[in-house]
Design a protein with these regions (language model features):
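Terminal peptide-recognition signature
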Residues: 16-18, 40, 47, 51, ...
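PDZ/PDZ-like groove recognition
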Residues: 24, 153, 200-264, 279, ...
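C-terminal cap/linker of serine protease catalytic domains
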Residues: 1-8, 114, 165, 169-222, ...
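Active-site region of chymotrypsin-like
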Residues: 14, 23-26, 33, 91-97, ...
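Flexible, gly/ser-rich surface segments that form the specificity/activation loops bordering the active-site cleft
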Residues: 3, 33, 55, 98-104, ...
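Conserved active-site neighborhood of the chymotrypsin/trypsin-like protease fold
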Residues: 23-25, 31, 37, 42-124, ...
Length: 300
């Protein structure tokens, strides 16, 4: 028990609370709101903080609060919508920070600790085990080849710190899921490690091909994928997709699942045409959508 307490107390100083304001007219405000709260992990003594993208996208102002109550104005230093991670920068030096665990060091059954903000200088802690490491696909045109699912439920705001029992950062807590019982889904810290220098230098990942963005919410349905909703003014809506459309094929490939849909879409680039075979009200037809650039649309 004393060892666990020492571990928690060693991690706490490197955890932060985030308060973010977003303009009413930013495209993300409709779904994510204009006043957001989050958690973050200090990953650099010079003030870089790792968190989740959905907390910071569109930020007009960011306030960072350390566990002892000291506050700093923050700036969004980098966004990576494909991984779902973001970096905040504060003007401070000599900060306590978390080291990244070795690459591919996380294993199923491994004990872990989550620390998340529940208030400006308040933190909550939960413990559990890694239950699985598998892909995840979300309805907002998002997919990761590997995630960390844990039996530890996120006790606070999104962006919480996931560490091993050596106090090393292994992930950033993104979602609480209720599919079977309660568990949390974290983005592996390896996604940050792979592009750390690019994110710090450019504020984005430039070495990876950009994915086209369509602005729709595909949902699995009876062995097919159906359009569950549309982003107003997005490419899918502008080129004629409608809510309720069943996607039969993309680029001549039959689509049976959301991962298959994303894999086919993402073979293209922003500005290129993507061909769909659609079933709508018992009529099937072909339709083309020119993919947009999500990073441009949601730029702060």
């Amino acid at each position: 028990m004393n060892g666990h307490l020492r571990l928690i107390h060693s991690i706490l100083p490197a955890t932060v609370d985030l308060r973010v304001t977003v303009p009413d007219n930013h495209p993300s405000a409709r779904n994510l709101g204009t006043e957001r709260v989050g958690s973050g992990s200090i990953v650099d003594a010079d003030g870089y903080i790792l968190t989740v993208h959905y907390v910071t996208v569109g930020a007009a102002s960011v306030t960072v609060t350390l566990v002892e109550g000291e506050q700093f104005p923050g700036q969004v230093a980098a966004q990576d919508q494909e991984s779902g991670l973001a970096l905040i920068k504060i003007s401070a030096h000599g900060l306590p920070f978390l080291r990244l665990a070795e690459r591919d060091s996380v294993t199923v059954g491994q004990p872990v600790v989550i620390i998340a903000s529940s208030g400006e200088s308040e933190r909550r802690v939960n413990g559990g085990y890694v239950s699985s490491m598998e892909p995840y696909d979300g309805h907002w045109e998002y997919m990761l080849e590997k995630t960390i699912r844990t039996t530890a439920f996120n006790p606070g705001f999104g962006g919480g710190t996931l560490v091993n029992f050596r106090g090393e950062l292994i992930g950033v807590v993104s979602l609480n899921l209720n599919e079977i019982g309660k568990f949390s889904l974290s983005i592996p810290a390896d996604y940050y490690r792979d592009f750390e220098q690019e994110l710090k230098a450019y504020g984005e990942v430039r070495s990876r091909p950009r994915r086209p963005w369509l602005g729709f919410y595909p949902q699995p349905f009876g062995g097919h994928v159906v359009v569950g909703g549309l982003v107003p003014g997005g490419p899918a809506e502008r080129f004629g997709l409608k809510e309720g459309d069943i996607i039969l094929r993309v680029e001549q490939k039959e689509i049976r699942s959301r991962p298959e849909l994303y894999q086919q879409m993402w073979k293209k680039r922003p500005g290129e045409r993507i061909s769909f075979r659609i079933l709508r009200e018992e009529r099937s037809f072909d339709l083309e959508v020119v993919g947009g650039d999500r990073s441009e649309r949601y730029r702060s």
